[in-house]
């Protein structure tokens, strides 16, 4: 018989119950006991949903109050020593301080979990880090599930992935792999505690196997699993997010009892493991996207596997369902307005039922679930033939693009002369990245307008009032190139998604980004086009208030793609180019309306990098082409800006230069302009605006601090190509500190201009 198990489940609840309880607890509106009760209730509901899908094993240990890697830091005693906390007796309050910081210590750094949009808390390893086991988190959840009469499988991130996703800290140089001999006995203790609590199978997650691991890390798997296999539980080694075919010989040799592979992201790896002689868990339902599976097609694969493996076949989702929204059935608006699209989707609970159907078909025959299989096929057929998805005009436009469609008319050296001829900017021109503070009044007006409580005319008047204020304040500060402040935008992707065809939105399609923060990504379900102008009216109104140049503001195609649930029936590169052409229509309309400085933000270009470096070039080629397609066709005198905010550029600088934006603004203040050095060494050919102060803090920098950064920038970038700007948009700041911060920036700029003019 085929076994059905779950790898992990969303933590926050169908209606973000955990988020709201956490935030009430942080505001001291509920007690710790009340928060614990909400969490216990959510865990029970999650397990019951898994049991209702006829799961043989429910997942335990995956629930967390903040992040599963933070739980592991506590369980192994690897919490940062700088907090002075005892990992053996850590209070919930202290746990949250690790994640959020306190008055004495900054929070543990966050970064993205492999290539997902989930953020984990990065372990801080020192040469002298000591580990100490505390299995309470995992044991408690195992016992809770057992008390409900359920068979449970604890899930723990493995020791090599744990070390891999951490960072070396401290003055002493060392390799974190050297900590393995100290860490391994602690893992043995944790697994032993789980065995003593009744665990039969333990899932150990090693997604690090899907990235380019150095040889010594790969070799280490032999000793690690030789040691862990001595624990008297059965071990399911779980891999996901990509192919592990290159490690097939190693994985087959490890003394574990089963292996999980991701057959959604990497179906081609099945051939490498079809002869595996232990339990093979096939991840066949997508744990990272929201599309209903064609179960008949999936069955073709798993029936062949079952014929080979018999009872050794397990089935599951490709990875934890953490990355998908909870329940499609609550999306009543979507069902009413887009019934076809609704029928093509599957959120977490629907995916559990897809797995139930697959298990029944395998164990009892297809006839036992004939109705469900017919419904799955009908949805797949409807989607394949829908005129809502496939549009001949969009396909033709892409197909008819000439070979040089993504190239500007002239090289940068010619364009910058044409731009400067009319812009007539001083040395060290100043600008803002885009957004200004989103006040309570702005949010209330937007909410009232969406609910129909505020007329379109009144809403427009409220937004224009905010725009006028933003323009006036920038003029008072003497900024050179102005922005309109984006008062009308709730979110930099959602705003455009609502105005482009091929996008849809949910009411409750939340997924956890980190801690209590959840995001509700748009769904790109069909061919993308722009029915009408999206930003022209706002930008031209702002331009009418000033003689200074006004920047048009757009979110770039790659970022819109990365921060959405993307259709899986055509290549992502094709979707990205469709978005690019829709944005290009907007660029040309802005230009026609007299907006001759246009910014196309691409904060997510780096996030899209594939896990394996061999796949980088292909991605960077189509990502760069998409950006250029969005900005092509305009006159040389129109200046295209882009903005990027992340901490590592060196390895993709040629690709960034190939995007050929006239001006790039980047986040650099927190790294003390270190990032800029890479641009200098690379001899980045176009204009650069390094951020001269950190907008993530309300603190107003001193003039000396800003001057220090600007002087460092002048050492690296030719002064005639240097812009001055904050690190990022000002949406999350208050007005008071915003104006004070910008005033400091302007004072320093004026001082250095005077000095350079001598």
UniProtKB/Swiss-Prot annotation:
Residues at which L-homocysteine binds: 433-435, 486, 601
Pfam families (UniProt xref): Meth_synt_1, Meth_synt_2
Active site: 696 (proton donor)
Pathway the protein acts in: Amino-acid biosynthesis; L-methionine biosynthesis via de novo pathway; L-methionine from L-homocysteine (MetE route): step 1/1
CDD domains named among the record's database cross-references: CIMS_C_terminal_like, CIMS_N_terminal_like
Domain of life from the UniProt record: Bacteria
Keyword terms: Amino-acid biosynthesis, Metal-binding, Methionine biosynthesis, Methyltransferase, Repeat, Transferase, Zinc
List of residues binding 5-methyltetrahydropteroyltri-L-glutamate: 16-19, 112, 517-518, 563, 607
EC numbers for this chain: 2.1.1.14
InterPro entries assigned: Cbl-indep_Met_Synth_N (IPR013215), Cobalamin-indep_Met_synthase (IPR006276), Met_Synth_C/arc (IPR002629), UROD/MetE-like_sf (IPR038071)
Top class in the EC scheme: transferase
Cofactor (UniProt): Zn(2+)
Residues at which Zn(2+) binds: 643, 645, 667, 728
GO molecular function, one term: zinc ion binding
PANTHER family documented for this protein: 5-METHYLTETRAHYDROPTEROYLTRIGLUTAMATE--HOMOCYSTEINE METHYLTRANSFERASE
UniProt record similarity statement: Belongs to the vitamin-B12 independent methionine synthase family.
Role according to the record: Catalyzes the transfer of a methyl group from 5-methyltetrahydrofolate to homocysteine resulting in methionine formation.
Name of the protein described by the UniProt record: 5-methyltetrahydropteroyltriglutamate--homocysteine methyltransferase
Species annotation: Neisseria meningitidis serogroup A / serotype 4A (strain DSM 15465 / Z2491)
Gene: metE
């Amino acid at each position: 018989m085929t076994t059905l198990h779950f790898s992990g489940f969303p933590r926050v609840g169908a209606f973000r119950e955990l988020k709201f309880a956490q935030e009430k607890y942080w505001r001291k509106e509920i007690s710790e006991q009340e928060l614990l009760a909400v969490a216990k209730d959510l865990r029970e509901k999650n397990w019951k949903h898994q049991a209702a899908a006829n799961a043989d094993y429910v997942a335990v240990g995956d629930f967390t109050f903040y992040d599963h890697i933070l739980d592991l830091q506590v369980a192994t005693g690897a919490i940062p020593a700088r907090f002075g906390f005892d990992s053996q007796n850590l209070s919930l309050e202290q746990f949250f301080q690790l994640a959020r910081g306190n008055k004495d210590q900054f929070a543990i750094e966050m970064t993205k979990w492999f290539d997902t949009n989930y953020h984990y808390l990065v372990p801080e390893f020192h040469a002298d880090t000591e580990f100490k086991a505390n299995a309470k988190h995992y044991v408690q959840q195992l016992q809770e599930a057992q008390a409900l009469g359920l068979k449970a499988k604890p899930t723990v991130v493995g020791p090599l992935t744990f070390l891999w996703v951490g960072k070396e800290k401290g003055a002493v140089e060392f390799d974190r792999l050297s900590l393995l001999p100290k860490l391994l006995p602690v893992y043995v203790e944790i697994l032993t505690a789980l065995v003593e609590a009744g665990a039969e199978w333990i899932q150990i997650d090693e997604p690090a196997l899907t990235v380019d691991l150095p040889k010594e890390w790969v070799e280490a798997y032999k000793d690690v699993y030789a040691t862990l296999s001595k624990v008297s539980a059965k071990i399911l080694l779980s891999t996901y997010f990509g192919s592990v075919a290159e490690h097939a010989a190693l994985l087959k040799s490890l003394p574990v009892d089963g292996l999980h592979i991701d057959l959604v992201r990497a179906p081609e790896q099945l051939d490498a493991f079809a002869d595996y002689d232990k339990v093979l868990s096939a991840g066949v339902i997508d744990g990272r996207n929201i599309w209903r599976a064609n179960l008949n097609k999936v069955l073709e694969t798993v029936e062949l596997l079952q014929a080979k493996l018999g009872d050794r076949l397990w089935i599951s989702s490709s990875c934890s369902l953490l990355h998908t929204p909870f329940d499609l059935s609550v999306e009543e608006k979507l069902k009413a307005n887009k019934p076809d699209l609704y029928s093509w989707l599957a959120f977490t609970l629907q995916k559990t039922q897809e797995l139930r159907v697959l298990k029944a078909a395998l164990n009892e025959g297809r006839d036992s679930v004939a109705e469900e299989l017919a419904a799955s096929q009908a949805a797949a057929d409807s989607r394949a033939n829908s005129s809502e998805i496939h549009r001949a005009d969009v396909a033709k436009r892409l197909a008819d693009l000439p070979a040089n469609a993504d190239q500007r008319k002239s090289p940068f050296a010619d364009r910058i002369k044409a731009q400067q001829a009319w812009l007539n900017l001083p040395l060290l021109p100043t600008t803002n990245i885009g957004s200004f503070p989103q006040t309570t009044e702005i949010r209330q007006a937007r909410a009232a307008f969406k609910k129909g409580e505020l007329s379109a005319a009144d809403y427009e008047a409220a937004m224009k009032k905010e725009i006028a204020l933003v323009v006036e304040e920038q003029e008072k500060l003497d900024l050179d190139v102005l922005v309109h402040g984006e008062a009308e935008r709730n979110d930099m992707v959602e705003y455009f998604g609502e105005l482009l065809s091929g996008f849809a939105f949910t009411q409750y399609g939340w997924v956890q980004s980190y801690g209590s923060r959840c995001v509700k990504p748009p769904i790109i379900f069909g061919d993308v086009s722009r029915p009408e102008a999206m930003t022209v009216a706002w930008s031209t109104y702002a331009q009418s208030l000033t003689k200074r140049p006004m920047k048009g503001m757009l979110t770039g195609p790659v970022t819109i793609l990365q921060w959405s649930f993307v259709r899986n029936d055509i290549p992502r590169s094709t979707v990205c180019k469709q978005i690019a052409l829709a944005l290009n229509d907007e660029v040309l309309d802005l230009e026609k309306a007299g907006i001759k400085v246009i910014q196309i933000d691409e904060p997510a270009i780096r996030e899209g990098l594939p896990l394996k470096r061999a796949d980088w070039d292909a991605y960077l080629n189509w990502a760069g082409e998409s950006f250029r397609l969005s900005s092509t066709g305009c006159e040389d005198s129109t200046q295209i800006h882009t903005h990027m905010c992340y901490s590592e550029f060196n390895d993709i600088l040629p690709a960034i230069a190939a995007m050929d934006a006239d001006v790039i603004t980047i986040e650099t203040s927190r790294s003390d302009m270190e990032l800029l050095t890479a641009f200098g060494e690379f001899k980045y050919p176009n204009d650069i605006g390094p951020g001269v102060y950190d907008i993530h803090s309300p603190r107003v920098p001193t003039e000396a601090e800003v001057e220090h950064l600007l002087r460092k920038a002048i050492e690296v970038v030719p002064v005639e190509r240097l812009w001055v700007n904050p690190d990022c948009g000002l949406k999350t700041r208050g007005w008071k500190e915003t104006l004070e911060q910008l005033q400091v920036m302007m004072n320093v700029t004026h001082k250095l201009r005077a000095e350079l003019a001598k």
